[in-house]
Amino acid sequence: MKSLVLLLLVAVTVSSVVSKPLPEDSEAEVHKEFETWKVKYGKSYPSTEEEAKRKEMWLATRKRVMEHNTRAGNGLESYTMAVNHFADLTTEEVPKGLLPMPRPEEEEVDKEFEMWKTVNGKTYNSTEEEARRKEIWLATRARVMEHNKRAENGSESFTMGINYFSDMTFEEVPKGRLMVVFPTRDGGEEAEVDKEFEMWKVQHGKSYGSTEEEAKRKEIWLATRTRVMEHNKRAETGLESFTMGMNHLSDKTTAEVTGQRLQDREEAEVHKEFETWKVKYGKTYPSTEEEAKRKEIWLATRKMVTEHNKRAENGQESFTMAVNHFADLTTEEVPKGLLPME
């Protein structure tokens, strides 16, 4: 696989020598890296002014490479990049045909970071500092995106967001996570909260079997709401690096949410097993309806085999069974003579 290098880089193989500077490198280490790069590619300049100009371009290239590779490390890019002998050239100076097209998603992430900096008034003392901060920001962004995907799938009871502290490590975020105490609700506020709950129910299609069940669920919802509000208050004052929100699991207990996650995980595992079985036996179906029907039969066969093998483990059966290429067929469809004797 080749490492595609954006702007001032050409394609090089992953196995080639890749510069791996760390964001926290000191100025002396970066200078040493530049000198090593010059020797490697036989670089020399006619004046100190020219060298300073070329070093600035090299630093900009190095920064882009580091940012890209950080995204690649977080799974946001499908390839890595490296610094090569064109790293001190402008886009116009690089020979035509050697510049890859910019990736739209990469441009979008860069634009998002720049907008975030503007909104939050962020400036940095050096390109190295900005690269380090962007790396942390990207990691926070990836974590928030992953969390929110789980929230969309019902595996989390709240959503998260990016805020002012998203370029800081956990150690750098101001300490003192004090619980925010909310004032007792008066009649007007209580009516607003009741209205909010009713709107939430409509939004997520919630209905309950009895007034007792609704009262119970509302209590859980209120506790979730309080926790989210307290967290977001801390986020506003800089004690958290992300914000939270309500979703369709906000009326469930932690145990119920965890149980849902387990159920979702088990269903995903069984689905993966079915897909693997289809590939193994070359199974395809003419329609989604037919596949759904066959999967139901396969699931019933799988259940029967699993139960039988549990009995075999306990000494209640003298043999074990396995799922084979007939597992999506009914008893009538299996060729005669291939079914075990009763």
UniProtKB/Swiss-Prot annotation:
Glycans are attached at residues 153, 184. It comes from the Eukaryota. Transmembrane segments: none annotated. Inhibits papain and ficin (cysteine proteinases) but not trypsin (a serine proteinase). Residues 1-19 form the signal peptide. It is found in: Cytoplasm; Vacuole. This is Cystein proteinase inhibitor protein salarin. The keyword rRNA-binding does not apply. The keyword Glycoprotein applies. The gene is salarin. One of its GO terms (molecular function) is cysteine-type endopeptidase inhibitor activity. Keywords: Cytoplasm, Glycoprotein, Protease inhibitor, Signal, Thiol protease inhibitor, Vacuole.
